[in-house]
């Protein structure tokens, strides 16, 4: 939702849902870990009340442990943290799950799958970033397609891909094994309902081709 019009956030969510969106994703940034400042638990709680879709949160903050409970109490469905930044990662992941949310770990473009191997049994999903952290609208990093394949080789967890997802890049990631895609700028550059439909159909076409359908 980083690329949405925040003055009409509930309506923007509704439009994406009409286009087939199955969850809502937003990035929480603190202007410390990354040079951008976004939203907090109060906005998350409002968003949860405005939609029946699951709300997925990526904590791009310097102290994610301090925000786990506030976002869980806001009603989000899943919380993603970054292994290289999160102190006491096992404890944080355990708290996320104890509070009733799914827990995910992020692989940035510079992070290899082997760096999270030890925590995989305690996760519900893995997120592969196909752009750098901090800003929406960045260009897709093509090398991340191979990283998605590598993650699929080392674990059976669902892989979510975030960054640079369009009708052109969605098929690449689906064919590589991604189970969920986060699209932002490509959705809100035009009519969110129609743009979402285009991206989803592109991904589904890739699935049909892979299955010989």
Question: Where do the language-model regions lie?
Answer:
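Active-site/ligand-binding-proximal alpha/beta "capping" segment
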Residues: 125-133, 137-180, 186-187
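Conserved N-terminal beta1-alpha1 strand-loop-helix module at the mouth
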Residues: 1-80, 84-88, 95, 101-103, ...
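Short beta->alpha connector loops at strand-helix junctions that form conserved
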Residues: 82-84, 107, 129-130, 184-185
């Amino acid at each position: 939702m980083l690329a949405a019009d925040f003055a009409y956030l509930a309506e923007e969510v509704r439009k994406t849902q009409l286009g087939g969106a199955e969850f809502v994703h937003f990035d929480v940034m603190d202007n410390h870990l990354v040079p951008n400042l976004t939203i907090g638990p109060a906005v998350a709680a409002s968003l949860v009340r405005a939609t029946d879709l699951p709300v997925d949160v990526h904590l791009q903050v310097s102290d994610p442990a301090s925000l786990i409970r506030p976002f869980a109490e806001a009603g989000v469905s899943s919380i993603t943290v970054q292994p290289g930044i999160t102190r006491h990662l096992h404890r944080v992941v355990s708290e996320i799950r104890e509070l009733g949310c799914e827990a995910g770990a992020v692989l940035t473009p510079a992070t290899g799958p082997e760096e999270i191997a030890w925590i995989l049994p305690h996760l519900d999903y893995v997120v592969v970033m196909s752009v750098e952290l901090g800003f929406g609208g960045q260009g897709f990093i093509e090398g991340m397609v191979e990283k998605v394949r590598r993650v699929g080789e080392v674990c059976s967890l669902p892989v979510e891909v975030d960054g640079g997802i369009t009708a052109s890049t969605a098929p690449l990631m689906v064919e590589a094994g991604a189970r969920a895609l986060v699209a932002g700028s490509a959705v809100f550059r035009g009519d969110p309902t129609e743009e979402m439909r285009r991206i989803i159909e592109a991904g589904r076409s890739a699935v049909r081709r892979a299955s010989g359908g």
